[in-house]
């Protein structure tokens, strides 16, 4: 029978799980500080970190993130995207759905711009970040400064 990634986590040796937890705490030191708290008492940013950390415990080859910056303070958004960039560098493939185009394009290798559910543009993230249509519509005048 096929087993899920979640059940595979529990079949692993405690030492391996501890090492994975140390890696997650290395990415999210704030979770280490809050390890005795229940998830319901964490801030929105801490909950986002917890969700990503839980997913990483399963050693995924693909990590899907849907609007990781939604509702978070700008400082926490920067922290989350710095971690996404670090994860990308480890070889984990990340499928990121994000309305914050500037932050998404800074950490992406390739991007897709959707308009009413259809792909309007796609290409290397750096190319999209410099595309006048993307700048005018999604990045605004600040990108031109």
Where are these regions (language model features)?
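Short, glycine/charged-rich "phosphate-handling" switch motifs in NTP-dependent
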Residues: 110, 122
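Helical segment within the ABC ATPase nucleotide-binding domain
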Residues: 78-90
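ABC ATPase C-loop
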Residues: 55-56
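Conserved ABC ATPase signature
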Residues: 38-42, 46
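Catalytic Walker B motif of ABC-type/P-loop ATPase nucleotide-binding domains
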Residues: 63-67
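Conserved catalytic motifs of ABC-family nucleotide-binding domains
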Residues: 59
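Single conserved hydrophobic/aromatic residue that forms the stacking wall/gate
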Residues: 1-6, 10
């Amino acid at each position: 029978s096929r087993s899920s990634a979640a059940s595979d986590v529990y079949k692993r040796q405690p030492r391996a799980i501890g090492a994975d937890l140390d890696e997650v705490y290395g990415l999210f030191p704030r979770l280490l500080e809050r390890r005795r708290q229940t998830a319901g008492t964490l801030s929105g940013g801490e909950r986002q970190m917890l969700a990503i950390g839980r997913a990483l415990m399963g050693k995924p080859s693909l990590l899907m993130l849907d609007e990781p910056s939604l509702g978070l303070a700008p400082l926490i958004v920067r922290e989350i995207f710095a971690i996404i960039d670090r994860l990308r560098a480890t070889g984990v493939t990340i499928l990121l759905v994000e309305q914050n185009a500037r932050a998404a394009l800074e950490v992406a290798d390739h991007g897709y711009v959707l308009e009413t559910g259809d792909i309007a543009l796609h290409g290397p993230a750096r190319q999209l970040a410099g595309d006048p249509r993307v700048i005018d519509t999604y990045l605004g005048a600040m990108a031109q400064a």
